Structures are given as C-alpha cells and as structure tokens.
Amino acid sequence: TAIDFNQCLNLIQIIESNRVAPLVRVGANDSLLIKRAMDAGAHGIIVPMVNSVEDAKKAINSLYYPPIGNRGVGLGRAQNYGIGFEEYNKWAKTEIIFIPQIEHIDGVNNLDDILALEEVDGFIVGPYDLSGSLNVPGEWEHPDIVNALNKVKNVVSNHKKPGGFHIVHSNHKELEKRLADGYTFIAYGDDMVFFAETIKSEMNYISKIKEK
C-alpha cells in the first residue's frame, strides 16, 4: 500500500536497526522522490516502469552525485545532517543499490541492455503491469505473457546480476517455481492481499469445522 514520506522514514530506521539494507520502491522514476528516499537513509531504490536504457540512466542520474549522476547535495539523515557528508559520499560511490522494475514488454525486450549498465544491480519483474502491457492483464496462461516470462527467465540464466519477481498472491508452488527459474530476489505477497487471503482461508477452515 502507498505510504507517505514520514512513514517511509520510520520504516527505513526500523529496517536499519535490524542490520538490514533498506530498499525503497518509489512511486515513479522521479528525481525528487528518489533523492528524498536516499537522503532519508535508503541504501537503494527500486524504480518502477524502467523500459529502456534511457529510463535506467535517468534513475542513475537521480541516485548518484556528480560525476556519475546529477543528484543534488542534501544534508539530511543519510549524511548525518551535514556532519557525515564526506563519509556518505565515499559510501554512495560504490554501495548504492539500484533495482529497475521490469513491468512492460519494452522493458523485457531491453533487459539485456539495461543490465549491461554498471550501476544496475539486478531487476525485479512486476507481473501484473507486464501482462497489462500485452493487453492480457492477469491472464497468466496466455501465450504472450508465457513467452515474455520465458524470455526473462533466459536473461536470468545468462546473467550474474540477480533477477527478482513479485509474487503478488502468496503461493508455495509459485514460490518454488520462481526459485527454480533462478530468481533470487523475491517480493512475496502484498500486504492487503496477504491479509485478505489469509482471513478467507481461516474463515473457510472455521466453516468446515462448524459443519462437522
């Protein structure tokens, strides 16, 4: 679900306190959104609808300070409010994580070229929007979406950079399939979908017990 900036900041702090690298999925390939998340302390960004090398380079420009990118210098939490900018700048040159989200057939077709960029650390598939870009939203058995996902699977097999997949409806068989396909970066479920499906499952179980 969508969250505001203060909620994002709180989540970054909680995740960091558990010695895990916080990644923020921004709502758009927008320099202000990316900069705010990074200045708040995100270790990396997941950027939606990266369909081309040009889209990827736009995000890279927003993530990195010159000379790699054109990110403006802000003295926020990540830079220890100015006291730690020099240390942060050294860290940022090598440690920022950039994960493009591939959720359009154009992104699938350009995936090899996108992954060839040094600053790209991997990718994650957004299956629903990908199926929508093929005019078959949610039709997982349709030949066009099957072919597109097979093409991505081949890219995963031929690249050292990790491939990811968003499994929207948590399902053990789907999870096992994607892991077998070589995906190593899994977004498993969606908060509201997970709650709704779990409640439905439990209610069905309760109904069966009552019938006995």
Model-predicted regions and their roles:
Residues T1-K212:
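Expand to "…catalyze enediolate/carbanion chemistry for C-C bond making/breaking, isomerization
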